[in-house]
């Protein structure tokens, strides 16, 4: 009664009536709900109903046709400036998630298609010692039993695709684990109960693949250890930092004693993962210097997120929870790249290779923007802005079909992949097919454009990137729905670009434009236009695959004696467009 009167209600009955109307429950039930701990996991951001409740007060504009204003941009560029050869390091390495995923037939088909289209050099394979590959067992008397049959099948398949394995020595077979119940994503992530037993496993594995493929071949492969050791013990970290340092050193020596020429990388470090772990890899490298085990390369995991540990977690439990928010900055990856390059100089590591062995804007398998044109534009923007600055940019992941967690029973659930679970290419896949067509000579870049040359032809990549709003970055979907996912972009206007290229030799040219936007190349948007029903037959899936390809347009233009080529292009929100300019002889 006191709460009702203090809040301005005439009596408790009026208070209870309004509360039940607004929240659908009585005060006692409401208090019970409020006591439940609301936590966020790294797989899905919490949504706050009080924000969504404001939606009913918005004006209904469903019958109002809103014409988006068009911003204008002028690009003036001479193709006769200085140039240099591109390495295309974004094609250095790809990944499928866990090594065991390569055994899945559907994933093999997607992997084959992607590799045939792009031509990567390496594939990262993590979890090769996980129990699902049955690598390690023991007899009743404790004698170790090794089996590399499933690993052989994985390595045979990827090498037939002309992919060199990048082998991450992980995770821990349960029989070797100090903490048998310390599991994450289906694998044991404990430190070993015996480093000597672990090193025997590594040695047996190295000897096996050397016998099978030849030492000269595996010298061209790359090796690393573990995954994100700078996270808390409740994730991939060890109970004591020094325990991991020693684990690394003994594994490093084991590999180098077998073959000094094998490249052994820094354990993939989750960059600035959480409070208290920002300087982990700097401390680790200093320790390596003092202990003569400096890695041959650096390796990082990067997501445009901030992870904040839950201070109320139990140290006895391995179910550690992180709160997560997305970066509000559109330039997070660029800032990260420049920072690690500065730190490499400061540590006097020379030109020690830096591999981005896993990256995305989110680690979430249920972020609805993953299926949209946002992700294709995000990929293009970040690769072009950071082109060749690191030795690899390994996008996570190939497909939504990832075996480390259960998957929602729907087609577009916000998975990380370039392909849906049934092999439908998303807009993000086609971003890579456009990048693949860039030339080998870099001419220049600027505000949302990138220009290359290949022999007598020129390639111009344009994009209209917009970052999501503050609310979405902090977990509020607000008025986003399963089918309307672009409401989180405050600025949705198209941009009209006037492109003026000078010093183009006189003559006739074929202009070929390939573009990915909401009407071309986006399977999600095509699915929405089809009615957004679940696809129930192979024919429907095949139709969606064939109908959601990039747009394409060609025309012939003439360049006069002034050697100027002018083109006008309009890009929709989050559109990516490749313009190829080819002389006609």
Question: How would you describe each model-predicted region?
Answer:
Residues 1-33, 53, 58-60:
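Sequence-specific DNA-binding recognition helix
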Residues 175-176, 180, 223-231, 274, ...:
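Active-site-proximal loop/short-helix segments
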Residues 95-99, 128, 170-172, 226-228, ...:
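Active-site beta-loop-alpha junctions enriched in small/polar residues
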Residues 131-135, 174-182, 231-234, 305-316, ...:
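Short acidic/His/Gly/Ser-rich catalytic and metal-binding motifs that mark active-site loops
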Residues 12, 97-109, 143-148, 176, ...:
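Acidic-and-aromatic substrate-binding clefts and catalytic sites of carbohydrate-active enzymes
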Residues 14, 33-168, 175, 179, ...:
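Non-catalytic accessory regions flanking glycosidase/transglycosidase catalytic cores in CAZymes
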Residues 413-418:
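Short beta-alpha connecting loops at secondary-structure transitions
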Residues 241-385, 389, 411:
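Noncatalytic carbohydrate-binding groove/subsite architecture in carbohydrate-active enzymes
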């Amino acid at each position: 009664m006191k709460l009702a009167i203090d809040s301005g209600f005439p009596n408790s009955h009026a208070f209870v009536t309004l509360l039940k109307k607004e929240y659908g429950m009585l005060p006692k039930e409401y208090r019970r709900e409020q006591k439940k701990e609301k936590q966020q996991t790294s797989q899905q951001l919490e949504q706050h109903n009080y924000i969504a409740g404001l939606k009913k007060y918005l004006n209904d504009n469903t019958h109002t046709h809103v014409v988006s204003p068009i911003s204008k941009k002028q690009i003036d560029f001479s193709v006769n400036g200085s140039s240099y050869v591109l390495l295309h390091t974004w094609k250095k390495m790809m990944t499928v998630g866990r090594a065991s995923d390569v055994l899945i037939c559907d994933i093999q088909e997607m992997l084959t298609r992607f590799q045939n289209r792009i031509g990567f050099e390496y594939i990262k394979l993590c979890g090769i010692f996980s129990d699902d590959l049955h690598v390690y067992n023991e007899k009743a008397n404790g004698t170790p039993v090794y089996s590399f049959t499933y690993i052989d099948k994985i390595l045979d398949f990827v090498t037939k695709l002309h992919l060199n394995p990048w082998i991450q020595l992980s995770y821990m077979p349960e029989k070797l684990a100090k903490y048998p119940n310390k599991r994450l994503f289906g694998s044991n992530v404990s430190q070993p109960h015996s480093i000597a037993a672990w090193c025997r496993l590594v040695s047996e594995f190295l000897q096996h693949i050397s016998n099978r493929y030849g030492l000269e071949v595996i010298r061209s492969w790359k090796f690393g250890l573990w995954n994100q050791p700078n996270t808390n013990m409740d994730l991939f970290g060890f109970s004591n930092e020094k325990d991991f340092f020693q684990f690394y050193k003994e594994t490093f020596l084991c590999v180098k004693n077998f073959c000094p020429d094998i490249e052994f990388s820094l354990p993939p470090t989750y960059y600035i993962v959480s409070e208290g772990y920002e300087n982990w890899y700097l401390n680790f490298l200093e320790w390596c210097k003092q202990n003569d085990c400096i890695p041959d390369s650096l390796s990082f995991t990067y997501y445009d997120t901030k992870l904040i540990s839950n201070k109320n977690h139990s140290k006895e439990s391995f179910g550690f929870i992180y709160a997560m928010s997305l970066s509000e900055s559109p330039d997070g990856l660029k800032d990260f790249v420049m920072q690690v390059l500065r730190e490499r100089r400061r540590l006097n590591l020379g030109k020690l290779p830096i591999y981005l062995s896993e990256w995305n804007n989110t680690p979430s398998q249920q972020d609805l923007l993953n299926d949209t044109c946002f992700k294709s534009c995000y990929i293009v923007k970040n690769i072009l802005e950071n082109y060749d600055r690191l030795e690899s940019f390994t996008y996570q992941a190939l497909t939504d079909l990832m075996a480390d967690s259960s998957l929602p029973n729907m087609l577009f659930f916000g998975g990380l992949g370039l392909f849906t679970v049934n092999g439908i290419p998303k807009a993000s896949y086609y971003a890579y097919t456009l990048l693949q067509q860039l030339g080998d000579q870099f001419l220049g870049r600027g505000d949302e454009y990138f220009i290359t040359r290949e022999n007598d032809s020129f390639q111009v990549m344009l994009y209209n990137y917009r970052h999501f709003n503050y609310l979405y970055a902090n977990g509020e979907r607000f008025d986003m729905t399963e089918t309307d996912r672009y409401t989180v972009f405050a600025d949705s206007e198209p941009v009209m670009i006037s492109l003026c290229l000078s010093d183009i030799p006189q003559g006739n040219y074929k202009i070929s434009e390939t573009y990915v936007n909401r009407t071309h190349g986006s399977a999600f948007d095509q699915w929405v236009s089809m009615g957004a029903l679940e696809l129930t037959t192979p024919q429907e899936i095949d139709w969606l695959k064939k109908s959601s390809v990039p747009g394409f347009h060609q025309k012939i233009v003439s360049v006069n004696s002034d050697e100027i080529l002018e083109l006008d292009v309009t890009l929709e929100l989050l559109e990516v467009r490749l313009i190829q300019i080819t002389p006609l002889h």
